[in-house]
Structure formats: structure tokens, C-alpha cells
Regions:
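N-terminal amphipathic/hydrophobic targeting modules at extreme N-termini
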Residues: 11-15, 23-25
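Secretory/organelle targeting and membrane-embedding segments
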Residues: 24-204, 208-549
């Protein structure tokens, strides 16, 4: 049977103009019927030709923290993938900056090995060498003003040599303690001055502060030397195709948006579950915990996309305005609400895929008496016409049963009246599941008659999987985001008000949990779905978590 594929929809590297007002319209226009994936790729020139360069401005990409894990595992592989798909400009340079003494040739040798190690597919040596030829290194202490004097000299030289036209992109792949310091030092040297003829942008990784006051302080420090339009606060979850597709799914399909409200939706679940423990991040995690690490950014950003109103246009500011409205409308919690509507947990020893794993307190760099939560669950409400009375259940945790990130929208059950004289005693509600990772896709469960002389209703699924329709393109989740920063498209990045609104949701919970001490933590065995108290959170409302097995 022929399948319908919207032109340009599912490429994470789709070229975008600086004016993104037609973003979703471009995703869904000119639909065509093709018989299979091969025909789709043949008929869609996007798979064969690079864009015309308008959204690939010359760029000098400066990575602070170039020797770190993020650079190795995410940034370099993403840049390699962009180069492979012809989505980097010819005038492109990478300058790594870090405190480890090393020259450019040594750094190139290291990155050559990193590319080989981190790629799940055979490496194209031509692409690899093209990228390595544009790679340079500067050794220096981030806190030393002399580092920025040498950086200024090197930027001038590389800009002239490679024709990057003064467009500098600074990526903070460092510990959060350096964010404000680096920005201030760059500002002191005039290296973030933004003009019409060239761009200067900064990308900042999470965490954006560790509470509301620190987030405000960081935003203030950044705005002393930068305009808000120059700051790109990155959340790699928003780079995932299935998260981006929520907007298309909602606003490009006439059958879903009319029922996307309190009249038809019973509740929403957002789950980010990991089977991994804290690994080598024990020291960081002791200061953060599951709530700080995941909720103000990943989970609340997904919630905002699910719950936002349609923007007037798909201009970046219009989209970000609507997301901010959702966060602003989340019902604030008082201490009693926190006690009744949140659960904190910590994993103990257990089995993951048949393998014994240590309890959190036995992990490296973790306090043996730690009260840091590795699991967080909560019920949130949104005070709006669309969502009044619809609970949003959020949970995230480590060492859980299955690695899964998904959004579950459960619709209200149909009335039973039609089937009152049949053996049917209950109707299963329709459930829409948006799988963000792994097995990216969307499924919808609905009732169907079981064959036979009696009227019996069973549940069946309509299921869409990205890989089945569009193949398995290499992606780290960073490709789209890096491409968008270079193009000046801030749609998928957090604005300062959204960051602070996220912390305003989390701060009251943190304060109550900290005041409770050991009484706040509920323990769970590794390999389960968290503490029983998380199940009770939904059970008291007559609902259940949707768990994979």
C-alpha cells in the first residue's frame, strides 16, 4: 500500500531560512504519494542535494571544554554528521579551548581517534579529513585574562585564513561554574560584539543554575555582555525528531487539535526513564539530583510543547512566547501540595537486564548516607481554559526497568450505553503514545470488535515508527540544534524567562524535600519502576502509570 510522506518533514537537517515564519507550512506543503522509502528518497531532492548555503553562514566554532566528554561524545559526532550531509559551510573552522596542554596536531590526533570510536557506522575518510583540516587548539585557563588575549589573536588569524566573515559561535561545554566567567572575559575583549555584518553567539549547556536565584544571577551576568538574542540555552531533548514532531503532529493534522483539550483528554503522562545509574557523574549528581537535573529543562520543555497554544506564526519568538505562557500557568505548589503531589526516590541494589547493580549510596563519589533523589514524580496542573482539571503526571529516574522517554495522552472513555446489553462491561480508553526514545514513533490504541458471534471489544494499535518509514539516519540529537544556532534560529532554545519559570515550578518542591531530610526519600530496587509511592500518586486519582516491560 502506498504511504504518504510530507516533503521535508522528517530530516533533522532540513535547511531553514533566518525567517522561520513558514517553518511548519514548509514541513507539510506539497505532500506526495510514494510507494516506499527508496521512492521517497529518489523523489525528494533533500536527500541528494545540499541547500543553497543561505542557512549555512561562514562560522568559526569555538568550543570551551574541548577535551571534555560532551565534546567527544556529542559535539564532534554531530559536526561530522552535519559535514557528511553537506550542512556545514565551506568556510567553517573549529577552535578547541581547554586547560590541558596540547598543540593543534596533537588535538587533531585525539579527535581523529574520537571520531572513529564514537561512530556506529563506517567513517568516510574524506569527510573526516575535511573536518580535521579545519580543527585548531588553544591551551589556556578559562579564568586567566591572558587566555582571551591569545584567543583574540587566534580568532583574528583564523577568521582571515578561512574567510569566516567575523561570525563567531562560542560553545560552553564546560562546568557551569565557568559560564559567567567565560562570557564576561569574552565581553571584556570585545569578542561578543554583535553587528549587522556579522554574528556573535553563545551556546550554554544545562544546568542553567541550581535554583531560581542562581538562574536569575546567571541570566543577569550573561545580559551584562550579551543581548538575549545572542544567547542559546541548549536542551538536547528538543533536538530529537519526535519532540520536534509534536508541533507538526498537533498543528498540521486537522483531526488531533480539536480534541487536544480538557473535554476529551483525561490526563497526560511524561516519562523519562533510564536504566543507567549515575556512572562517573556521582560528584555532580550529589549536588543536583533527579529533580534539578531533569525537570526544569527536559520534562517541562516537553510539557510546554504538548500543552502550548498554536502560535500566530512559527517565528521563534512566537513559539517561545506560547511555551512561556504554559510554564507561567502551571499551578504553584504550597508545602501541603508538595507533600501530596510529589514523590522522591533513591535506587537500592537490584537487577538491570539480569545483571546485579550497586545501590546509589555505593556509587563512586557518592556519600554513603546520601539523601539525594535519583527518582522524582509529581502531579502538575495548568490553569488555562484548555487544560483546567487535566492532571499532568511527570516522572524521571535512574536504574528503572526500561530506558524509555515518552508522552502518553489518555483520552476520556466513551460512554458504555451503546453496549449495555452486551458482554462488554468496560471500555478501554484511547491512548496516544509519542515515543521519544528509543523506538521513536507514535501509536494510537483504540477499541475494535473481536471476531466471533458475540460483541466483544478488544484493544488494537495503529503504530508509526520513524525507522520503518524514513530509515535510520545517524544522529546525536545535536545536529539540528547546532545547525539552527549557525542559522540564527532560536525556536528550539530556552529563553531566560522560560528558564526562570522552570525553576519557579521546581524551587518549592526542593525546599520541602530538603526540610524533610530522610523522610522525603522513598527507596526502590534497581530494575523496577520506582518506589510504590509513585504508583500511589496516580492510584489515589484512579489512574495508573503506563509501564513498559
Amino acid at each position: 500500500m502506498a504511504k504518504r510522506f510530507p516533503v521535508e518533514q522528517f530530516s533533522s537537517l532540513t535547511p531553514r531560512a533566518n525567517d522561520t515564519s513558514g517553518k511548519v507550512r514548509e514541513l507539510v506543503k506539497n505532500s506526495q504519494i510514494v510507494s516506499n522509502q527508496a521512492d521517497y528518497q529518489k523523489e525528494n531532492a533533500l536527500f541528494q542535494q545540499p541547500d543553497n548555503g543561505q542557512t549555512r553562514p561562514p562560522t568559526l566554532f569555538v568550543v570551551f571544554g574541548a577535551q571534555g566528554d560532551l565534546t567527544k561524545r556529542k559535539l564532534i559526532p554531530a559536526l561530522y554528521n552535519l559535514a557528511s550531509s553537506h550542512h556545514l559551510p565551506q568556510e567553517f573552522v573549529i577552535l578547541g579551548v581547554d586547560g590541558i596542554p596540547m598543540d593543534t596536531e596533537e588535538f587533531r590526533g585525539k579527535i581523529r581517534l574520537d571520531i572513529q570510536e564514537m561512530s556506529p557506522r563506517p567513517i568516510d575518510s574524506t569527510i573526516k579529513e575535511w573536518l580535521l583540516d579545519r580543527l585548531y587548539y588553544l591551551s589556556g585557563d578559562f579564568r586567566n585574562p591572558q587566555t582571551y588575549e591569545r584567543l583574540q589573536t587566534m580568532l583574528t588569524e583564523l577568521n582571515a585564513r578561512h574567510g569566516t566573515q567575523g561570525n563567531y559561535l562560542y560553545y560552553m561545554a564546560t562546568a557551569p561554574t565557568f559560564f559567567a566567567e567565560i562570557a564576561q572575559q569574552l565581553g571584556a575583549k570585545g569578542l561578543v560584539e554583535h553587528r549587522k555584518e556579522f554574528s556573535r553567539r553563545i551556546v550554554i549547556e544545562k544546568p542553567f543554575g541550581h535554583d531560581l536565584p542562581s538562574a536569575r544571577s546567571l541570566n543577569q551576568s550573561l545580559r551584562e555582555v550579551l543581548e538575549e538574542s545572542q544567547i542559546y540555552r541548549i536542551d538536547h531533548y528538543l533536538g530529537k525528531e519526535t519532540v520536534q514532531n509534536i508541533l507538526v503532529f498537533r498543528f498540521a493534522n486537522g483531526i488531533f487539535e480539536p480534541v487536544w483539550n480538557r473535554q476529551y483528554i483525561d490526563h497526560v503522562q511524561i516519562t523519562v526513564a533510564e536504566t543507567l545509574g549515575v556512572e562517573h557523574r556521582g560528584a555532580y549528581y550529589e549536588k543536583a539530583g533527579a529533580l534539578r537535573d531533569m525537570v526544569p529543562n527536559h520534562l517541562l520543555q516537553i510539557l510546554a510543547i504538548v500543552a502550548m497554544e498554536p502560535p500566530n506564526t512559527f517565528d521563534p519568538e512566537a513559539v517561545r512566547n506560547e511555551k512561556a505562557k504554559v510554564l507561567r500557568a502551571i499551578q504553584p505548589m504550597n508545602p501541603v501540595d508538595v507533600l501530596q503531589s510529589t514523590v522522591a526516590g533513591q535506587y537500592e541494589a537490584g537487577l538491570i537486564s539480569g545483571r546485579s547493580v550497586l545501590p546509589y549510596r555505593a556509587e563512586m563519589h557518592v556519600d554513603p548516607t546520601s539523601l539525594t533523589e535519583t527518582f522524582a514524580a509529581m502531579t502538575l496542573g495548568i490553569e488555562s481554559w484548555r487544560w483546567e482539571g487535566v492532571p499532568f503526571y511527570l516522572r524521571t529516574g535512574k536504574r528503572l526497568n526500561t530506558r524509555s522517554t515518552e508522552v502518553v495522552i489518555q483520552f476520556k472513555s466513551a460512554p458504555l450505553m451503546l453496549f449495555r446489553k452486551t458482554p462488554v462491561d468496560r471500555l478501554t480508553p484511547n491512548v496516544l503514545t509519542i515515543r521519544i526514545q528509543p523506538d521513536e514513533g507514535i501509536s494510537l490504541s483504540f477499541g475494535a470488535k473481536i471476531p466471533g458471534p458475540k460483541v466483544q471489544v478488544g484493544t488494537v494499535d495503529m503504530d508509526f515508527q520513524y525507522t520503518e518509514y524514513f530509515g535510520d539516519a545517524p544522529s546525536t540529537g545535536y545536529e539540528t540544534l547546532l545547525h539552527d544556532v549557525m542559522a540564527g534560529d532560536a525556536t528550539l532554545f530556552q529563553r531566560s524567562d522560560s528558564v526562570e519559570l522552570g525553576w519557579s515550578v521546581v524551587d518549592p518542591i526542593l525546599k520541602v524535600w530538603e526540610s524533610l531530610g530522610s523522610h522525603a526519600i522513598h527507596f526502590y530496587n534497581a530494575g523496577t519502576w520506582g518506589p510504590p509511592e509513585a504508583d500511589a500518586l496516580l492510584a489515589k486519582d484512579g489512574r495508573m502509570w503506563r509501564n513498559h516491560t
